[in-house]
Amino acid sequence: MSQRAIGAGYELQARHYLERAGLTFCAANVALRGGELDLIMRDGQTWVFVEVRYRRSDAFGGAAASVTYRKQQRLLHAAAVWLAGRGASFDTSSCRFDVLAITGSQLEWIPNAFNAD
């Protein structure tokens, strides 16, 4: 099985988890100039951009620790481009950035893991 297929499986698991938590699915694997958005969800009127990370173990800090500052900046840029394509921005839309970290068989949802400020 390819890495891409494995990643897609974890993203689907994350999507279902978030849907059960009450979020609404909008899009997955949105490739934009400068980055990719794993999942785009809605929580009421809030756009939720979700980074899904998987690590087999927490030997090197686990999945959540792998979302570095540089990765955050790429996600912020990709989300800004995505919003601009809809005539919106961080100033005109309610947005948040969540991380759904899967380490081994443990799933951890981190709402508001970082922000655009």
Swiss-Prot record:
Pfam family, one: UPF0102
Highest taxon listed in the record's lineage: Bacteria
One GO MF term: nucleic acid binding
Classification via InterPro entries: Restrct_endonuc-II-like, tRNA_endonuc-like_dom_sf, UPF0102_YraN-like
Record-linked PANTHER family: UPF0102 PROTEIN YRAN
Protein family (similarity comment): Belongs to the UPF0102 family.
Database matches in NCBIfam families: PRK12497.1-3, YraN family protein
Protein name, UniProt field: UPF0102 protein Spro_4337
